[in-house]
Amino acid sequence: MKNLLIIFTLLFSSVFLSSPSFAGWTKVDEGGGNTFYVDFERIRKHDGFVYWWELGDYLKPQMGYFSAKSYNIGDCRLFRVKVLSYSWHKEPMGGGTGITVNIPDNWRYPNPKSIDEYKLKSVCSR
């Protein structure tokens, strides 16, 4: 019985804890059944810029998708952000194969007291 418990524990850990869908995501906002996360564990800084992943998880599908992930670059000195890549996912928490979307190559300045301002301040301070 003890061996069965050990095997079950190892199997459970390898399936759920190693899943990239759930690793590292920290909830930063929620509303209307939607939840938004930042992966603070994978923040990278280089040449004065900060790079990070975001995830939006939707209660009701958005255009047929239950989640979306983006990879972003932030300029902490000028306090602006640009999305480098964006993908929609059929499964929650960024699961399943992503459909990459073309995005405009422009910098955005977060509105004061917005979730975007909070996220940029959070990643810049890490």
Predicted regions and their residues:
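N-terminal secretory-pathway/extracellular module detecting exported/lumenal segments
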Residues: 20-126
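N-terminal signal peptide c-region/cleavage motif recognized by signal peptidases
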Residues: 13, 18-20
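Positively charged n-region of N-terminal signal peptides that target proteins for export
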Residues: 1-5
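Hydrophobic helical h-region of N-terminal Sec-dependent signal peptides
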Residues: 6-13
